[in-house]
Each structure stands twice: as structure tokens, then as C-alpha cells.
Amino acid sequence: GAVSGLLTNLGL
């Protein structure tokens, strides 16, 4: 999903 992608991108 979009949220999961963003979190992974931030390294969270």
C-alpha cells in the first residue's frame, strides 16, 4: 500500500 511504501522509504 501507499502508507507501507512511505514507511519503508523512510526506513521506519
UniProtKB/Swiss-Prot annotation:
Secreted found in the keyword field: yes
Keyword entries, A-Z: Secreted
Tissue: Expressed by the skin glands.
Subcellular location field: Secreted
GO CC annotations on file: extracellular region
Keyword Secreted belongs to the record: yes
Protein name stated in the entry: Dynastin-7
Annotated organism of origin: Limnodynastes salmini (Salmon-striped frog)
